Amino acid sequence: DSNIATEPSAGVYESGIFTLLSGTEPNEATGQDGDAQDGAPGGPLDLSGNMTVDMGFFVPVSIGSYVWEDLNVDGVQDAAEVGLPNATVALLVDNGSGTFVAATDVDAVAVVNQVTGADGLYEFDNLPPGDYRVRVTPPAGFEATPNQDTTANSDGLAADELDSNIASEPVSGTFESATFTLASLGEPNESDAADGDAQDGAAGILSDLSGN
């Protein structure tokens, strides 16, 4: 288990207080990675050292990135089609029981809804790994394109970055994506050719691989 208790300064983490006494410390678990104490389990050396102070870390994930006006209603972002401004974008997360609720970031702060600008871009970052959905309310007068790709970029190909991922209309005039399972270092590379990519970092480095 992770023993992080505080963050005394940004990016620096500390455990709680451990009082060490000879002959009173935990037995070393057999086969545990990280155990480096000499002596037989339960022996004097083992009982005089605490090998349980482990620290767990992960790479935050992100999701985005584009709401556009589909002029020819084919579900594909063509070169002449531009971003759609004034669309409200919300992020939902599975609460562990299959119910999607408003998302929070890695600091347990509520993720704020975004309103797209003229470029149609949005991005939610600093997220814990999990199952997410994106909910979009377009400006008045706009409807969802009937041709949708709901596979949630399952093949990781750049072409999927151009496809609409709307899967349902839970509320009239509000549209929701399919579920995206985001994992640290497990997401597709962004392509330089696709409008809507707004992720920092070059293809192949950590920040790029942590976004979808």
Regions found by a protein language model. Name each.
Residues 119-123, 134-137:
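Mobile, glycine-rich extracellular loop/lid and propeptide segments
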Residues 1-48, 96-111, 147-212:
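Surface-exposed intrinsically disordered loops and tails
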Residues 52-78, 82, 88-92, 203, ...:
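A short, Gly/Thr-enriched small/hydrophobic beta-strand-prone motif that recurs across taxa
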